[in-house]
Amino acid sequence: MANPDTIFSTPIDKIGDFTFDERVAEVFPDMIQRSIPGYSNIISAIGMLAERYAKPHSNVYDLGCSLGAATLSMRRSINQEGCQIIGVDNSSAMVERCRLLVNAYRSDTPVTILEADIRDVDIQDASVVVLNFTLQFLAPADRHALLEKIYAGLRPGGILILSEKYIFEDENANELLIDLHHDFKRANGYSELEISQKRSAIENVMLPDTIDVHKKRFNDIGFKSSEVWFQCFNFGSMFAIK
């Protein structure tokens, strides 16, 4: 059973910026399930998409892999000779735990977990690239360049899977979706204090875009098609095909 997330359950005098440290890594499976609506569906479908798009003798990347949920879903689904998965995360706590989880089961599809900044990783001969709730934590000025690098490293016909929290230009719609997300967290046992303190900790480090901004970025870079394939409240996932 996952360790329960109680990080923000007691009053914090000075709330610092949210970081993916040892405390977060320890409770991350519980935190993510109780915080992101539809997370399990997204993870399952990433495996389905990887099964469809992974090619023999190609690389599959999970950028910002955290504890490897998407990596493991893809490994279970991919059955292509010479295909390998490369997971990358800059949190040493996440990488250490991810390696343990990956090594707990053997598979014909090799997996390498790297501790690195995803902006510094070479993307080469890729058939699938996953950014699962990762891009939103990069500085907005760095996002286009990373996606350009991913595009350059993808094979023609390759797929980028981008899961994100969204904001919406319609103020009323945006507020409703935020409120529904908070209702979701309440229904999963988070208190008003936890919701408030987590929001304060994360508001300066997670800066979401609109769906239109994502689509324009894909189009400007040269992806031939892109679309939202999953959305629940203000969270969702898109694909972009080279």
Curated annotation (Swiss-Prot):
What biological process terms from GO does the record include? tRNA wobble uridine modification
Q: Name one Pfam family in it.
A: Methyltransf_25
The answer to whether keyword Transferase applies is yes
Quote the catalytic activity from the record.
Answer: prephenate + S-adenosyl-L-methionine = carboxy-S-adenosyl-L-methionine + 3-phenylpyruvate + H2O
Q: Per the UniProt record, which EC number(s) apply here?
A: 2.1.3.-
Q: Could you tell me which cysteines form disulfide bridges?
A: none
The UniProt GO MF terms for this protein read:
carboxyl- or carbamoyltransferase activity; S-adenosyl-L-methionine binding
- The answer to whether the entry has keyword Transferase is yes
Enumerate the CDD domains for this protein: AdoMet_MTases (cd02440)
Residues the record lists as binding S-adenosyl-L-methionine: Y39, G64, C65, S66, D89, N90, D117, I118, N132, R199
Gene3D superfamilies assigned: Vaccinia Virus protein VP39
> What UniProt keywords apply to this chain's record, in alphabetical order?
S-adenosyl-L-methionine, Transferase
PANTHER family cross-referenced by the UniProt entry: CARBOXY-S-ADENOSYL-L-METHIONINE SYNTHASE, TRANS-ACONITATE 2-METHYLTRANSFERASE-RELATED
Which family does the UniProt entry place this protein in?
Answer: Belongs to the class I-like SAM-binding methyltransferase superfamily. Cx-SAM synthase family.
Q: What does this protein do?
A: Catalyzes the conversion of S-adenosyl-L-methionine (SAM) to carboxy-S-adenosyl-L-methionine (Cx-SAM).
Assembly behavior: Homodimer.
Q: What is this protein called?
A: Carboxy-S-adenosyl-L-methionine synthase
Q: Which organism is it from?
A: Aliivibrio fischeri (strain MJ11)
Gene name linked to the record: cmoA
